[in-house]
Amino acid sequence: MECAQPALSDFLADHLAPRRAQGPGVVHAADAEGLCAVIDEIAGTVKRIAARIAQGAIGGARPAMPGDTALGIAVQDLLIAMCERSAGIAGLVLPGMAAARPTSAGRYVLFADSLDGAANAESNVALGTVFSIRHAGAASADGGCVIAGSRQLAAGYALYGPATIFVITVGRGTHGFTLCRERGGFVLTHRSMRVPEQGAELAVNGGNERFWEPPVQRYVSECRDGSAGVRQRDFETRWIASLVADTHRTLMRGGLCLLPRESRCAPRAARQPLLYHAQALAWLVEQAGGLASTGRARLLDAAAGQDTHARTPMFLGTRCEVERIERYHREHERGEDLPFTSPLFNERSLFRPEARV
């Protein structure tokens, strides 16, 4: 690997320095140094997580609760220990936590899923870590950690695959780093990543199609029809069941990653945790020129209220594909996608929606 590729810490120092000036969405001087330190700490923990994942089923404590795995517990413990050592992280929110866990008197709250795709571990399939950094407020009366505002200061993910990839944004583009064993850290390998303007891949679990809303069923059906249908080009379907891996492929190759609302059970009707999954990945994709939506509105504009585990449907990827799925939702709500049922022409009618390109 070429030595000209900057290390993560050097890149962050240069990348955040120009943001000390005032402006919309700008990280202030007080945050620039703190964010550099926290992102460096997260990257160091990602290295340790990658080493632990590489051990597979070797060693580790037995699961304490049904559904837990030894690997999942070990990875979560690494992230918690990092937050407790950090001078910059005031609190941590992980899946299953009732509220933000206070860790220090720092400036930031870290929202994270320490091991996305954990169910894939036994199959030796790619796993991930996803995170979002936001401002912390004053401590609450019960000693808890208060989250101040909804604006993200930084977001990113780690993908543990053939290589360990660390992808981040602080609002000035999306950038990817690869773990270099020889140099002992992450080096910049993907500067200013861009979602391709055209993509022909769908990341979706087709086994749940019967639970989707009609506009999603319409979109996926048209893609499956390929060049013989209204889309007039062929699509491929991929589904890893690891959101970080599916998002990374969409970021690199374009297309659409879909986690739609499902009707089968109300608590999971809206699929993805908003604060530590959906909005982190949405910001990364938008900073790379793509779009991210709930199907009805911009994902980054969605509000969680007081619920740190609020969930949302999620569609992200190539701009034109996200715009299409949003249009299908609007047409469905206006009743414009209903089949034309003329007793004279029925399915041969030119007025059916399928006949309109």
Swiss-Prot record:
Biological process according to GO: fructose 1,6-bisphosphate metabolic process; fructose 6-phosphate metabolic process; fructose metabolic process; gluconeogenesis; sucrose biosynthetic process
GO cellular component, one term: cytosol
CDD domains membership: FBPase (cd00354)
Catalytic activity: beta-D-fructose 1,6-bisphosphate + H2O = beta-D-fructose 6-phosphate + phosphate
Pathway involvement of the protein, from the record: Carbohydrate biosynthesis; gluconeogenesis
EC number: 3.1.3.11
GO MF assignments: fructose 1,6-bisphosphate 1-phosphatase activity
Subunit details: Homotetramer.
Entry similarity comment: Belongs to the FBPase class 1 family.
Protein name: Fructose-1,6-bisphosphatase class 1 2
Organism: Paraburkholderia phymatum (strain DSM 17167 / CIP 108236 / LMG 21445 / STM815) (Burkholderia phymatum)
Organism ancestry: Bacteria, Pseudomonadati, Pseudomonadota, Betaproteobacteria, Burkholderiales
Gene name for this UniProt entry: fbp2
